[in-house]
Amino acid sequence: MGAIPKTGTISPEQKDSQEKNLFQKIWSWEIGVIPLPLYTVLAVIIILAAYYNELPANMLGGFAIIMILGVFLGDIGQRIPILKDIGGPAILSLFVPSFLVFYNVLNSTSLDAVTNLMKTSNFLYFYIACLVVGSILGMNRIVLIQGFIRMFVPLVAGTIAAVAAGILVGFIFGYSAYDSFFFVVVPIIAGGIGEGILPLSIAYSQILGSSADVFVSQLVPAAIIGNVFAIICAALMKKLGDKRPDLNGNGRLVKSKKANEIFNQKEAEAKIDFKLMGAGVLLACTFFIFGGLLEKFIFIPGAILMIISAAAVKYANILPKKMEEGAYQLYKFISSSFTWPLMVGLGILFIPLDDVASVISIPFVIICISVVIAMIGSGYFVGKLMNMYPVESAIVTCCHSGLGGTGDVAILSASGRMGLMPFAQISTRLGGAGTVICATVLLRFFTS
């Protein structure tokens, strides 16, 4: 007879299996897409290099710092309850690095590396060019044209209402119309950080004479506060729609089946082609350079002319389809891989904590809230007049006050209406681009 194993004992095979399962479980934990053990090793290497002043003060060292922090903060921001629903990754990626600089956690070696990447090598401008050009060229042309026609009145009405409310409430609290408009209202409705705040900061710096980082720290707080309240308003509109079925299109914006079919058509996703992505890099760089060239003759900041020229080329259908696909694939790669790392760089260099604290106050927050309420309220009532469902119209118009594509996702998720994404993109991209262009022209006019 074989020996009977004692109760509670584990055979060597079972022990090996348990250890293997534990090892696999640990490797299944991820920070972003990186297994936790590997992420830990990478982080330790980078931290030690920075501590012993061996971190290269160039693009390599800069990317190492912003990537290791951006991957971590973006992942954590997507996991924390409540925070994840109000733009957590963006908030953490911008402000945690700012705290690290304020409390001298990051040494001069790390700061030099990030400075060389963001300022000397101008990764910031490269990111802006890829996002703006790729997002515009990648839009469905029919949706772009028809969406602009359909959303023109609600967008214009919402923008006018937001501007009027912001200036009026600002006046009550002692803000000048100039400060309320250019530093509170405009950042909220500019289309996010990458495609709104950053081009704006460049334009403001060229017109007013200070460096772009000065304006980033002044513009970002309004954009983030506006985004948070826009998400809250979207959730409240969902509750209103649940209680009032007559106001609710259940995800349909217009009271016309044919019109909804136009906006819901999807183009087949092209297979990823790295050569086309390379062409996308060339297109993004050239559009940026073209904007700078035109600036010499038109006297409008190059970043704004880049937006206008990309939209004009898309509207005229000039580029071969595969070139547009290359620019769009590059846009998706850059936006999905470098958004949180870039915001880490912005937080380190462009958002001094003391400057941000000096901007935010109770009146400032109330002005931001009034802008969003005016935007969503105008969308509601204009939607009623234009054969749209008021709840959906209000939610789509509300996207104009969110943090770009990230804000669109958060707002539509909070309202349970992800099917409105094509309209949200029109509201955010075209509305944001229009805001940036108009604000720049007006600022030039008032300071000339």
Curated annotation (Swiss-Prot):
A Pfam family matched in the record: 2HCT
Molecular function per GO: organic anion transmembrane transporter activity; symporter activity
Chain segments annotated as transmembrane: 31-51, 60-80, 86-106, 123-143, 153-173, 182-202, 214-234, 276-293, 297-319, 333-353, 359-379
Induction: Expression is induced by the two-component regulatory system MalK/MalR in response to malate. The regulator MalR binds to the promoter region of maeN.
Keyword Cell membrane: yes
Biological function: Acts as a Na(+)-malate symporter, as it catalyzes malate-dependent uptake of Na(+) and Na(+)-dependent uptake of malate.
Name of the protein described by the UniProt record: Na(+)-malate symporter
